[in-house]
Amino acid sequence: MATNKFLSILLLSLMAFAAILLPMISGQIITCLPGECTNPSECNAACKSNGYKGGACVSMSIGSTTGACCCKPNFKSQDSFKSNDIIINNN
């Protein structure tokens, strides 16, 4: 009984750890600009001026009227890479 409970807790801990670690490993860390964010269009413009795809105000607590301006990364997935100039040499 105690072993089953320990294994359940261990499994849940590993799942939570993986859920936190996977975005970091894949490089999908979201950048947030310093200061408060009250206007989403200003946040979007600020992110675009810094080279990001865009941005949005993200509330850090429930019921908060302000948040942080977080930017969307401006890179493509490696899966979307297509090239027609691949040479296959069968020598």
UniProtKB/Swiss-Prot annotation:
Highest taxon above the source species: Eukaryota
Primary location group: secreted
Signal peptide: 1-27
Keywords: Antimicrobial, Disulfide bond, Fungicide, Plant defense, Secreted, Signal
Disulphide bond pairs: C32-C71, C37-C57, C43-C69, C47-C70
GO biological process: defense response to fungus; killing of cells of another organism
Compartments in which it is found: Secreted
GO CC, one annotated term: extracellular region
Similarity-based family: Belongs to the DEFL family.
Protein name listed in UniProt: Putative defensin-like protein 83
